[in-house]
């Protein structure tokens, strides 16, 4: 795999009229909190009330106190917002949110980008909530400038980024030489760059799209980030990685805590993520570079990736390490549906012998369907360089026209357990293709005998409800039902739909119970 670098706007202006039309009343701050209001028609010398609002978000950020809520009226705000004042655990967060059903837009059109900078940024602050904004049009054509839609940096805790729409954040410079390894743009970025971590961060319900990222990522947690939840986001149509959990890039002062960790990546939908035609990936190849992951863990640890949909990307999900002698570890990938990705469904291990390893990870109860669509023979599961002590169980893998199911082109592969999976391929059991420790085997039986893998696995049609319509629930007669290995320590409590994970005699194979 070739990789270069990191893979109606205005609401009603009269609240009473809105209530008369049946709109919900605006939310209220807690009894101990204070309410402030900002409007494009306001003035920063006003009182900051609903009747006499401020004009700028920055004035509100410089004034708000712990436990307060800044209600932002609909309209366009063409200024950056830098939040450095904190809420508190006792009084509550400082919350910046849209007013009622109105949509405030923070628009970066014409604004300069200074080094690495967020259109909205939270620097060394804690107990902050940013909710219900559209954040857009923050761009540059200058190398070494990094525009970010929402940027959280330094240290802090108790930060929530909720229900925001982030789009058209771009660096359109054409990289050359060493610039291929640089950072270019992000939709949402969390960089733990201090000895104290960024902890307790929630990124939920956001939409990120039309981002020109170069060698960077759509949504990323990097460095000293400890305890995070990336949930229920929609990430699509961007030119590099969708969601990334990163370690060992030198973001934090010490390697000892330079890993995003103790995280949850759940309920996200990620699609149309591709590095093809991205100049940061060098000369365009005949089939494209196909190096951008929908969901990626690069050096992170102790994280669960579950109940996500990842499709029409270059790679569905990857757990790997780009840094030699460093490992991505203790990642559980379970109950995800991964389909129609160009190179492979799930990848693990370093992408060449100069990279790091994947160790002590679990890939369980996923449904992988017809990935490997562009003829690169990545199969449904791509086992790369230096994989150790990983568990791969209870997965459905249905091959594309390539007929490749598992592709492992490296001999440095020790202690991995592969069993209780269900496989299917257009060429049938005898014509299915497998590469294990760099040796090609044709046919399921030949692969089992030669490798010792999959002694309890099946080769059969999984009988999806409607695969043409991408409904990967199981028909009542599916051989995957009750055919898995019920290890409650790793399969999780719920399937892709949030239903109890075990309902019959044993767990089903695949994402659907």
Question: Could you say what each language-model-derived stretch is?
Answer:
Residues 1-12:
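Bacterial N-terminal signal peptides that target proteins for export
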Residues 17-28:
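C-terminal segment of classical bacterial N-terminal signal peptides
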Residues 28-58, 76, 100-102, 462-468:
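Right-handed parallel beta-helix/beta-solenoid
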Residues 58, 62-66, 78-95, 104-131, ...:
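Extracellular beta-strand-rich solenoid/capping regions of secreted or surface-exposed proteins
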Residues 77-82, 108-119, 139-148, 170-186, ...:
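Short glycine/acidic-rich loop motifs that flank beta-strands on beta-rich extracellular proteins
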Residues 93, 97-103, 126-137, 157-170, ...:
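Right-handed parallel beta-helix
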